[in-house]
């Protein structure tokens, strides 16, 4: 079995990623800030162990890697937070929290894992979960788009520097996904209908849409895909002209 580490494993998207990997020849280290959250995922899955660590804390992540028996073949940086509100209303602490978790946390987890891959001569894969906000930032979400576009830039830099060791680094940018931190947003029937209709495929995405993309990028079939961001959004970021009047 291959070894995977998934951060943010306690959420809906994290659970689906862990589930997909655990059913496809991976032993999964399900990581969340609180052990109770990671246990909610691991208790429902085979081949999955729960771990608690703070992705923002380098020592916490080093300790995590020492607890996991095997060097990872795959790292999925899925942990992320948002502090909603317009920029004028954002506190500096809000901004810093999002940057620390989404960008710096991903840097710490990926770098510590990659060091171990290199030491063990393991040609692994790292997948960073970004967002369509990294392509077209939306208002009212504070530092979130900035961290996601920064994470894509970090993805490309990691891929360039670590490619010589056989480590591939890619990103996945989810669109309107009915899971995780977006799920409460889509519980409003009006929002759910309008957002679904805005997508060329006429539906919201599911957590499985992202989990399946993770599985593909981690596979041998994707062995020559590197330094890329796969946008999984049903085409919504390219749909602006669909919604403008033509006469």
Question: How would you describe each model-predicted region?
Answer:
Residues 171, 190-221, 225, 232-234:
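C-terminal helical subdomain
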Residues 10-11:
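Conserved glycine-rich cofactor-binding loop
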Residues 163, 168, 225-227:
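Short, small/polar-rich loop/turn modules that mediate ligand/substrate recognition or access, typified
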Residues 226-247:
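Short C-terminal tail/terminal secondary-structure segment
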Residues 110, 147, 155:
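Active-site helix of classical SDR
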Residues 86-87, 94-99, 195:
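Substrate-binding pocket helix/loop in short-chain dehydrogenase/reductase
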Residues 131:
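Residue(s) in the substrate-gating loop at a strand-loop-helix junction
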């Amino acid at each position: 079995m291959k070894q995977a580490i998934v951060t943010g494993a306690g959420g809906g998207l994290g659970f689906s990623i862990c589930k997909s990997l655990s059913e496809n020849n991976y032993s999964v280290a399900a990581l969340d800030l609180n052990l109770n959250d990671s246990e909610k995922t691991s208790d429902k899955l085979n081949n999955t162990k729960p771990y608690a660590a703070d992705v923002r804390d380098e020592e916490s992540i080093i300790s995590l890697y020492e607890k996991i028996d095997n060097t990872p073949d795959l790292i999925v940086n899925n942990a992320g937070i948002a502090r909603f509100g317009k920029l004028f209303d954002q506190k500096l602490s809000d901004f810093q929290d999002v940057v620390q978790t989404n960008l710096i946390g991903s840097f710490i987890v990926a770098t510590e894992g990659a060091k171990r891959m290199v030491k063990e001569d393991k040609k692994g894969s790292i997948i960073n979960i970004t967002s369509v906000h990294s392509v077209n930032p939306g208002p009212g979400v504070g530092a979130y788009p900035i961290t996601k576009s920064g994470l894509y830039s970090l993805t490309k830099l990691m891929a360039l520097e670590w490619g010589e060791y056989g480590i591939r680094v890619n990103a996945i940018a989810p669109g309107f996904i009915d899971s995780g931190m977006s799920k409460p947003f889509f519980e409003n029937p009006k929002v759910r209908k309008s957002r679904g209709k805005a997508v060329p495929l006429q539906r919201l995405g599911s957590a499985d849409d992202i989990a399946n993309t993770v599985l593909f990028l981690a596979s041998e079939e994707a062995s020559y895909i590197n330094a890329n961001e796969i946008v999984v959004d049903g085409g919504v970021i390219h749909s602006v002209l669909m919604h403008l009047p033509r006469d």
